[in-house]
Curated annotation (Swiss-Prot):
InterPro entries: FAD/NAD-bd_sf, GIDA_C_N, MnmG, MnmG-rel, MnmG-rel_CS, MnmG_C, MnmG_C_subdom, MnmG_C_subdom_sf. Homodimer. Heterotetramer of two MnmE and two MnmG subunits. Its cofactor is FAD. The lineage of its organism: Bacteria, Bacillati, Bacillota, Bacilli, Lactobacillales. GO terms for biological process: tRNA methylation; tRNA wobble uridine modification. Keywords: Cytoplasm, FAD, Flavoprotein, NAD, tRNA processing. This is tRNA uridine 5-carboxymethylaminomethyl modification enzyme MnmG. SMART domains: GIDA_assoc_3. NAD(+) binds at residues 276-290. NAD-binding protein involved in the addition of a carboxymethylaminomethyl (cmnm) group at the wobble position (U34) of certain tRNAs, forming tRNA-cmnm(5)s(2)U34. It comes from Lactobacillus gasseri (strain ATCC 33323 / DSM 20243 / BCRC 14619 / CIP 102991 / JCM 1131 / KCTC 3163 / NCIMB 11718 / NCTC 13722 / AM63). Residues 203-232 are annotated as: Disordered. It holds the Pfam family SAM_GIDA_C.
Amino acid sequence: MKTYESNEYDVIVVGAGHAGVEAALAAARMGEKTLLLTINLDMVAFMPCNPSVGGPAKGTVVREIDALGGEMGKNIDATYIQMRMLNTGKGPAVRALRAQADKWQYHEHMKDTIENEPNLTLRQAVADELIVEDGACKGLITNTGAKYHAKSVVLTTGTAARGKIIIGELTYSSGPNNSLPSIKLPENLEKLGFKLRRFKTGTPPRVDGNTVDYSKTQEEPGDKEPRHFSYTSKDSDYLKDQMSCYMTYTNTVTHDIIRANLDRAPMFSGVIKGVGPRYCPSIEDKVVRFADKDRHQIFLEPEGRNTKEIYVGDFSTSMPEEVQLKMLHSVAGLEKAELMRPGYAIEYDVIEPWQLKHTLETKNIKHLFTAGQMNGTSGYEEAAGQGLIAGINAALSAQNKPGFTLQRDEAYIGVLIDDLVTKGTNEPYRLLTSRAEYRLLLRHDNADLRLTEKGHELGLISEERYAKFEAKKQAISRAMAAIKKVTIHPTDEVQEYLASVKQDRLNAGVSGADFLKRPRVTFDAVEKLSGQTLATDRYVKEQVEIALKYEGYIKKEKTLVDRLHRLESKKIPVDIDYNAIPSLATEARQKFEKIRPESIAQAERISGVNPADLAILTAYIQQGRIAKIKK
């Protein structure tokens, strides 16, 4: 292919999925002339799998993206068809917002945002080869021969990298949803010395909603109380005309059909070589792994207002189409369901993420960043969070400024990236609340308090929005001071209220703050019983209530964070030679050499490293006896 010189940009982003759009928008909004390349303009921010955003941990990531100035929260708030808060009966650390998306509107709204963003050019092309000179990425070459030069490049190839779709005995080269695969770029990455591996994910069948018998299912409506992902959304805009999802179950007949056809299941016949996601297994995998269960939950989710396609959630499969039909028809409510699209598995290349820095810049090629599913994660939200960080750092790199990172105590995005670059991953990585040590600090409700300041410093939060944020912080401080001054006396009204929430009687007057610390006592109750208005904004009330009720636990986590910061401050020299440190265990030495931790805190998080190895490394550095620098 003959090449030709095309335009120059500050930042080029390859791939316009959920990672790519965040990366491109961030770079452009930071003032960099940005090019966003995509294999197909009709698949910008497309949802090839579940038509939803949020859920446990993931919903918090969307709030963090919004607090930093990203787009996902605004986009889903403009295009959802249902909104629900999950885990409302549990503590604030695990509450999670989830939205059912109109997948077509989601794509169109995001594409419109990109097309109207100054500094950002959107173009359809396939990136085939990177331009690398003197260990730095200087641009790329497309399949049409165009040479684009740039100061920074971000790769977000998703599942397109040497993608292969599998449906029973049928296999063919393809990206998600039958789009073109990217073949030459992963080959080019291997030539440049990157280690790649194969992962697999899957998607369930879609059925015609007109052929579903909903009377045999359980309706799952949205919340009436206004909920939003973006801190800029207004309660008055909350959608009242929401669409319901529906729940049904597999049964022993379904499981018998699956077991009878396991010899034709690519998951078990050896056709699929890639490692699949542990936390999103196929239905055939669930039936085999959990043989004692006689049923599995299935959610029927509408894909949008202007389509009858129904996503059969938790029913991911790569069985042959005829077997998929039998499986579907055995499920209550789906006996006469007509298949519109079969489920499929897709295998694809991922980069081993330990080859990345916390900025998501690659270690062996400067100014090259990777984000999203190609880093080994699963999920739109995980991809978008990485895309935002990669885009920010690509812009900073183009400006010759220091990189931007998030610590484990600052954001779920920080936990996600640290896990990837420190531990790598042997399977598609899904963010879970259990992965965060400081999850009481990393709540869904306080993402703005944690990150808006950082977004403003980066130039991604407007002055108007920042002023509103400052006003909210001041309102929280005023409400906290006010509730501590209020006294609740043991009146008959107070005693009746306490009895209604199953709390012990009050023997003497207490401050409103101490009264609120009691289980099931609310901020509104303190206002009513004291006869005083302490705050008007429900989000301000929420912050005060959580801060007081969980004061002891939050204090405990902050003590742990102080220890983390002390260890993070103990930096490890970039060119340290671990082979020159005596007494280090072989496994620790090998892991340190491979991952090249930046601090003692990161070294501590590497699996296979024991306390003795850390003590040796720490002492060696503290004594100033830095191992010989490699020549």
